[in-house]
């Protein structure tokens, strides 16, 4: 089973908080890194590096430039998972052991926003 959108958002929110201090509750799929979250290019590179480490993916510089929103990163990671199901399974186990509360919080927030 692939990693869910909520699990990826929770992981990215933790990374963004660590790099920038932005509260995870502020991180939603439609938020733009530059326009909404005011993340500069240096911080974006740090977020990308930590995302690569956390999710076991490689984000080439030319792809990074096109990832403008949190949702773009989620879709990118999900696409990479579809291309490598074994890595996705290992990632799911890692995420479930690392941050189940963060995932539940994001899931509840997204459900509330969709109502």
Swiss-Prot record:
UniProt-listed GO biological process terms: acyl-CoA metabolic process; lipid A biosynthetic process
The keyword Chloroplast is annotated on this UniProt entry: no
Modification after translation, per record: 4'-phosphopantetheine is transferred from CoA to a specific serine of apo-AcpM by PptT.
In-chain residues carrying the UniProt-annotated modification O-(pantetheine 4'-phosphoryl)serine: 41
Positions of the Carrier domain: 3-81
Gene3D superfamilies (alphabetical): ACP-like (1.10.1200.10)
Key word Lipid metabolism present: yes
Role, per record: Acyl carrier protein involved in meromycolate extension.
Protein name per Swiss-Prot or TrEMBL: Meromycolate extension acyl carrier protein
Native source organism of the sequence: Mycobacterium tuberculosis (strain ATCC 25618 / H37Rv)
């Amino acid at each position: 089973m692939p990693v869910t959108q909520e699990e990826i958002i929770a992981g990215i929110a933790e990374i963004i908080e660590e790099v920038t201090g932005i509260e995870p509750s502020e991180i939603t799929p439609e938020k733009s890194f530059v326009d909404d979250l005011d993340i500069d290019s240096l911080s974006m590179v740090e977020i990308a590096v930590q995302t690569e480490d956390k999710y076991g993916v490689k984000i080439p510089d030319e792809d990074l430039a096109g990832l403008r929103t949190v949702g773009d990163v989620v879709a990118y990671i999900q696409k990479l998972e579809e291309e490598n199901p074994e890595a996705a399974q290992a990632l799911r186990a890692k995420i479930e052991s690392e941050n189940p509360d963060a995932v539940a919080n994001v899931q509840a927030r997204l459900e509330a926003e969709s109502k």
